[in-house]
Design a protein with these regions (language model features):
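Covalent nucleotidyltransferase
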Residues: 1-92, 216-236
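Nucleic-acid 5′ end/cap handling module spanning
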Residues: 1, 97-202, 206-209, 216-220, ...
Length: 237
C-alpha cells in the first residue's frame, strides 16, 4: 500500500505505543464530526500535498487510527484466533490518536444502537477465526444504509448500463444528488423512452439526456457528502 504518514503527522506518535515491539496492525484512519466518524471530513485531508496546509488541517480536522486487529507482535499472530489476537491488542493502551475496537457479544443490540446513532455499521466475526487477509464468509460487514426516494431527472447511456441522474426538490428547484445504474435489460430501462427535455437540474451542468422529473426511485446510500451527493448509492428493489 501507499505510505500516507506525511498526510497525518499526528499519527507519527503511534510508534510510541509499540514500546520496542515490532507491530503490524489492521485498522483505518478516521476523522470525526460531532463525535461520529465522517468520511467527508477525512476527504478534506486525504489528498493534500502542501505541507503548510497539512499542518493547518491537522489542527482543524484531527484524525485517529482505529485498530481492528493485530497481525504481528514480534511474531506472526495471523494463525491465532480472533479472541487471542484481541488479547494481544488490548495490552496496548489507547491514546488520543490510537483507539482499539471492542468485542460485543450481542450483535443485534449493537446494530440497533449503531442505527440510532447514525453510524456506518458493524462487522460480525467468528470468535475463533484466524486472520486470512481477504474477504471470507465468517467475517460479515453489516452496513447501516439509509433509504430515500429521489426523482429521475435524466440519464447517461453507457456500454451495457444506464446511469440515472437523481435529484430532490428544494424550494422549487431540482437539486442533483448522484447517480444509480441499471443494466439495459432491466424493466426500469423503459423510463428512457420518455421525451427528452432541457436540463431540469439546478446544479448539474454535465452532459446527459434529461427528462421531466416525474418518476421516483427508492435508493439506499451510506451518507451524504459535504457537497450533498450520495455516498455508495444503489437502487433498492
Amino acid at each position: 500500500g501507499n505510505d500516507v504518514t506525511k498526510l497525518y503527522p499526528e499519527l507519527e506518535t503511534i510508534k510510541d505505543i509499540a514500546k520496542n515491539n515490532v507491530l503490524v496492525l489492521d485498522g483505518e484512519i478516521v476523522a470525526f464530526k460531532d463525535g461520529k466518524p465522517s468520511f467527508s471530513e477525512l476527504q478534506k485531508r486525504s489528498h493534500l500535498k502542501d505541507r503548510n496546509k497539512i499542518l493547518e488541517m491537522e489542527k482543524n480536522v484531527p484524525v485517529a487510527f482505529i485498530a481492528f486487529d493485530i497481525l504481528y507482535k514480534n511474531k506472526d499472530l495471523t494463525d491465532r484466533s480472533l479472541l487471542e489476537r484481541k488479547k494481544a491488542l488490548d495490552i496496548i493502551s489507547d491514546t488520543n490518536y490510537f483507539i482499539k475496537t471492542k468485542i460485543y457479544q450481542d450483535g443485534k443490540k449493537l446494530f440497533e444502537r449503531v442505527k440510532k446513532l447514525g453510524l456506518e455499521g458493524i462487522v460480525a466475526k467468528k470468535k475463533n477465526s484466524i486472520y486470512i487477509g481477504k474477504r471470507v464468509d465468517y467475517w460479515v460487514k453489516i452496513k447501516n444504509f439509509k433509504e430515500e426516494e429521489f426523482y429521475v431527472g435524466g440519464y447517461i447511456l453507457r456500454k451495457e448500463k444506464i446511469s440515472f441522474l437523481l435529484g430532490e426538490k428544494k424550494n422549487g428547484k431540482l437539486i442533483y444528488v448522484g447517480k444509480v445504474s441499471i443494466m439495459k435489460n432491466d424493466k426500469l430501462a423503459q423510463i428512457i423512452q420518455e421525451k427528452e427535455v432541457e436540463n431540469p437540474f439546478y446544479n448539474y451542468k454535465e452532459a446527459g439526456h434529461f427528462l421531466k422529473p416525474k418518476y421516483k426511485l427508492l435508493v439506499s446510500y451510506m451518507e451524504r457528502t459535504t457537497n450533498n451527493t450520495l455516498r455508495q448509492p444503489f437502487l433498492k428493489k
